[in-house]
């Protein structure tokens, strides 16, 4: 690496040193430019104004200059939130550039308002925008003000920009192949991806959605789903898109948190976004918004307590106080309703509008009846497997038994129910539910079993020993398929566990584990096939016949396993069962004395066991553990979401009767069929247009109702957004706390206030100051002060040292020097007295400010106290009663000889302070006025042009440092 810095070899004692130098040096600022930027930093309005005026005349200062951090004067003013200096700079036509973006990122609302209202004068010569942005811009070209404001999620700034009618580019679809997307991706794929990410980051801002969307809940649903799908395509930015998707989900959930009544909740959850569907009055109170939330997998929204409370109320309709009842009462009630489900179903078939017919339509009763029907079906399957009705086992085509005839209506009822569900919800929605796929497989197996039994009954009439049947006999295949369908039917009962709070999370964890098993099987099958191919290739030549083996048995199922790797299928079986320890090692032996072949085969077999058992199996366990832990961490949300999907399946109209009663046509079904047949094949003529007028009237009424419902929805959304914004701002202020930025703002306010006080004092000179790193000027001042201070240590804190009876009073380092006030003696007395009366309240307010910051209450007195908590021992100093007179020059000289010398007063011990103060006479009631007056009359004694309160910023720094450490000591200066 050293070769990058020097090339020739140097054998000097310092040859192991690497010379360093600045290779990318920047243009240095002049002394005037440094002073200009420093004045902007400190908030010195007068100095900045003077520098700008001189720049317009003499062109000695580049008002668009930048400090080493790339900040111009305008950016510094924005960072310090100094709006007065910002307005002053804009009035002098400084270069704006990215100032608006900078103000938005700093979240300075006042600066944003000022920049939005700023209009550049026409014809002015600005610095070229391209050069400035290319060199110093902190933002990419695709970032717009509204996008950056949305990234910061500042509601006030977003509102200001939206009122200006700003726009955001519309992102294309995820897999868009238009010319613009293809060309942009080919030219610069990184910029294309970053630009799309920035757009989606802006669109996902909760404040922007709340302000600009008519239906913010639906917008959050769709945007969250789109971002989730986009994370699967943009794998490089998967984490960012998933975070934005989660942000949209939480926004919809937080918005629903603001609902305060059941009416608001019902209006939100029953609202439809498609007006064509809203025109059907029978489909209004069907929780349309909640169905959309389930469709887009908005688990946080669905599991929200307000939503769950409304769902529970609808679910237990007709059973008030159900949750407060004892579990024994609940069990007996459910068992009673379950045993009565046949009578309730018959009552509904006969009279759907009767009390019993309406009772079975309730969601909870419907769930109990369907569960009881399915348990009855499982009980009959158990009877069929136990062969309660004995038949001849050797009949090739046996007729159906009584139990099988009883099972058939249930199977037909299940098939009819699945057909109706697919017809109502659509094929796409049907296949997205895994339980529907399981039902489809189960019903297919039952249909195949019934078909094969019919074929066997028709084709085979005789009796024959079962041992002599061929392998693919229809009866044998039907029995195998019926056994598999019994397993699936029993496992289907797990779906009902979702209704229970204890078994529901376990059922969800089981589903996640099945996904992990499928992922594991993909890798395992690859390993299995690889080793099966190798072992079969090695042992193919050593295959033996069955007659050569004991008991004429060939394969791994024999008492003595043999030919384990003779064929590919046999090898796959052998390797699979070896995972469970069911394969012996001697299967790798061969009858020939080929020890090398046996060694290679045993090594391959051992390697397979190590990979499958030690590596893959432990990986599967880790994956399943991770899935379970993921569910356990979000058990409440996952379970409530799954339970809601179960409940919603019973809230819908239709599917009231459980199998097998659902296959029986009801009078209502005959009525619907007759109306459809009459309207389709026998249309009636309507010469008077009576039906047309009736349809138009009903359409108008439904449309008016939909408009009213939409208006109610917009009112509720408006209230929810207001509450959400108020809560968001309140939480942000609560969580913000005290940060370093707060102390910087406090320091900036004190610095600005200091210059304002100096302007109020008047007669302040504006010296040109240099921000050079050399400390020559400071050392010169210190040497000057040291000359008058004797052997005292140097200190940056300089204050007045007033002699009183030839004894000095030491004060806190609050005031450095007083500027020279030329011509002060010539002013009239009224003017000086008015100035003194004006300055008094200002310093009183300053004392109150410092006392409040220390947590103390300060009462305004004739002698104001100024307290600074800087962790130093308390010291007190009182001004002497300085008698001021402007009558004649002699009296002024006599007053000047009262041993009032300006020097440096350091912070010392508090010892002797009381003694010194007791020797001094009491100060006048307006000590500050006396001090200002004597300073004006003795201006010739002041040989320093420094500001009055130059050390306030340093005292504030020390104050903040000590205040953070919890040291609340006080230094009090009495003026």
UniProtKB/Swiss-Prot annotation:
Belongs to the transient receptor (TC 1.A.4) family. STrpC subfamily. TRPC5 sub-subfamily. Expressed almost exclusively in brain, in mitral cells of the olfactory bulb, in lateral cerebellar nuclei and in pyramidal neurons of the hippocampus. Very low levels detected in liver kidney, testis, and uterus. Glycans are attached at residue 461. It is a multi-pass membrane protein. Residues 766-795, 816-838 are annotated as: Disordered. Ca(2+) binds at residues 418, 421, 436, 439. The chain crosses the membrane at residues 364-384, 405-419, 434-454, 477-497, 513-535, 604-624. Homotetramer. Heterotetramer with TRPC1 and/or TRPC4. Each subunit in the homomeric ion channel (via ANK repeats) interacts with one copy of GTP-bound GNAI3; the interaction is direct and activates the ion channel. Interacts with TRPC4AP. Interacts with SLC9A3R1/NHERF. Interacts with MX1 and RNF24. Interacts (via C-terminus) with CABP1. Interacts with SESTD1 (via the spectrin 1 repeat). Interacts with PLSCR1. Interacts with PKD2L2. This is Short transient receptor potential channel 5. Residues 326-360 dip into the membrane without crossing it. The gene is Trpc5. InterPro entries: Ankyrin_rpt, Ankyrin_rpt-contain_sf, Ion_trans_dom, TRP_dom, TRPC5_channel, TRPC_channel.
């Amino acid at each position: 690496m050293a070769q990058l810095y020097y090339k020739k070899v140097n054998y000097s004692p310092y040859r192991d040193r690497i010379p360093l130098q600045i290779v990318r040096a920047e243009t240095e600022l002049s002394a005037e430019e440094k002073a200009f930027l420093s004045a902007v930093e400190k908030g010195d309005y007068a100095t900045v104004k003077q520098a700008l005026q001189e720049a317009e005349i003499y062109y000695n200062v580049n008002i668009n200059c930048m400090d080493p951090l790339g900040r111009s004067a305008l950016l510094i003013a924005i960072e310090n939130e100094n709006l007065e200096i910002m307005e002053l700079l804009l009035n002098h036509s400084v270069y704006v550039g990215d100032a608006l973006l900078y103000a938005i990122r700093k979240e300075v609302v006042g600066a944003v308002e000022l920049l939005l209202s700023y209009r550049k004068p026409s014809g002015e010569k600005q610095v070229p925008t391209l050069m400035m942005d290319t060199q110093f811009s902190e933002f990419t070209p695709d970032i717009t003000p509204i996008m950056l404001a949305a990234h910061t999620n500042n509601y006030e700034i977003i509102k200001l920009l939206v009122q200006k009618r700003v726009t955001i580019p519309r992102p294309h679809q995820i897999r868009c192949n238009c010319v613009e997307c293809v060309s942009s991706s080919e030219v610069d794929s990184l910029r294309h991806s970053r630009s799309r990410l920035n757009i989606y980051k802006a669109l996902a801002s909760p404040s922007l959605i709340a302000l600009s969307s008519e239906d913010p809940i639906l917008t959050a649903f769709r945007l969250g789903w789109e971002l989730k799908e986009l994370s699967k395509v943009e794998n490089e930015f998967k984490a960012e898109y998933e975070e934005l998707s989660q942000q949209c989900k939480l926004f919809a959930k937080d918005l629903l948190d603001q609902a305060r009544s059941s009416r608001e909740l019902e209006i939100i959850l029953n609202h439809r976004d498609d007006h064509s569907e809203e025109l059907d009055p029978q489909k209004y109170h069907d929780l349309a918004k909640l169905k959309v939330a389930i469709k887009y997998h908005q688990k946080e929204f669905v599991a929200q307590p307000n939503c769950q409370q409304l769902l529970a109320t609808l679910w237990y309709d007709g059973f008030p106080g159900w949750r407060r009842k004892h579990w024994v009462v609940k069990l007996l009630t459910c068992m009673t309703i379950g045993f009565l489900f046949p009578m309730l179903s018959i009552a509904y078939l006969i009279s759907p509008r009767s009390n019993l017919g309406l009772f079975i339509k309730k969601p909870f009763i419907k769930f109990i009846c369907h569960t009881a029907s399915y348990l009855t079906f499982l009980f009959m399957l158990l009877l069929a497997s136990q062969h309660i009705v004995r038949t001849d086992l050797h009949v090739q085509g046996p007729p159906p038994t009584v139990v099988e005839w009883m099972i058939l209506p249930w199977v037909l009822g299940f098939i009819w129910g699945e057909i109706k569900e697919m017809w109502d919800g659509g094929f796409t929605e049907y296949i997205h539910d895994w339980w529907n796929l399981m039902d489809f497989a189960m019903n297919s197996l039952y249909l195949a079993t019934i078909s094969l039994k019919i074929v066997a009954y028709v084709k085979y009439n005789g009796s024959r020993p079962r041992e002599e049947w061929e392998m693919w006999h229809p009866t044998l295949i039907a029995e195998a398929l019926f056994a598999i369908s019994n397993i699936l039917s029993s496992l289907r009962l797990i779906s009902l566990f979702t209704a229970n709070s204890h078994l529901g999370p376990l059922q969800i964890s089981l589903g996640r584990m099945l996904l992990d098993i499928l992922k594991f099987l993909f890798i395992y099958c690859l390993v299995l096939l690889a080793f099966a191919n190798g072992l079969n290739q090695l042992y193919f030549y050593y295959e033996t016949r069955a007659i050569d083996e004991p008991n004429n048995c060939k394969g791994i199922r024999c008492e003595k396993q043999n030919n384990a790797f003779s064929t590919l299928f046999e090898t796959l079986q052998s390797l699979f069962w070896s995972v469970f320890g069911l394969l012996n090692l001697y299967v790798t032996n061969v009858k020939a004395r080929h020890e090398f072949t046996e060694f290679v085969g045993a090594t391959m077999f051992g390697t397979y066991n190590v990979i499958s058992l030690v590596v893959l199996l432990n990986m599967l366990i880790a994956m399943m553990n991770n899935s379970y832990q993921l569910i356990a961490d979000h058990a409440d949300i996952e379970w409530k979401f799954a339970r809601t999907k179960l409940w919603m399946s019973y809230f819908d109209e239709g599917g009231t009767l459980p199998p097998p009663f659902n296959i029986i046509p009801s009078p209502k079904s005959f009525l619907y069929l007759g109306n459809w047949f009459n309207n389709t094949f026998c249309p009636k003529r309507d010469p008077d247009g009576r039906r047309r007028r009736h349809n138009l009237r009903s359409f108008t009424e439904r449309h008016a109702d939909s408009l009213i419902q939409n208006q109610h929805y917009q009112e509720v959304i408006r209230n929810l957004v207001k509450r959400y914004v108020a809560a968001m701002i309140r939480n942000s202020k609560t969580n913000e706390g005290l940060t370093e930025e707060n102390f910087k703002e406090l320091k900036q306010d004190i610095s600005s206030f200091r210059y304002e006080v100096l302007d109020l004092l008047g007669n302040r000179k504006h010296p040109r100051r240099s921000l050079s790193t050399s400390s020559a000027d400071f050392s010169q001042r210190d040497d000057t002060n040291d000359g008058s201070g004797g052997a005292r240590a140097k200190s940056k804190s300089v204050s007045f040292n007033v002699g009183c009876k030839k004894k000095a009073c030491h004060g806190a380092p609050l005031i450095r020097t007083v500027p020279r006030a030329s011509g002060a003696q010539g002013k009239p007395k009224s003017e000086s007295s008015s100035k003194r009366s004006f300055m008094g309240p200002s310093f009183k307010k300053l004392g109150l400010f410092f006392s409040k910051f220390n947590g103390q209450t300060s009462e305004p007195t004739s002698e104001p106290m100024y307290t600074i908590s800087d962790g130093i021992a308390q010291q007190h100093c009182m001004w002497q009663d300085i008698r001021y007179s402007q009558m004649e020059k002699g009296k002024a000289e006599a007053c000047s000889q009262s041993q009032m010398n300006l020097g440096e007063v350091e912070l010392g011990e508090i010892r002797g302070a009381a003694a010194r103060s007791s020797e001094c006479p009491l100060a006048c009631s307006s000590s500050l006025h006396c001090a200002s007056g004597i300073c004006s009359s003795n201006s010739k004694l002041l040989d320093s042009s420094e500001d009055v309160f130059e050390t306030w910023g340093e005292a504030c720094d020390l104050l903040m440092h000590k205040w953070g450490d919890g040291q609340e000591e006080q230094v009090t200066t009495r003026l």
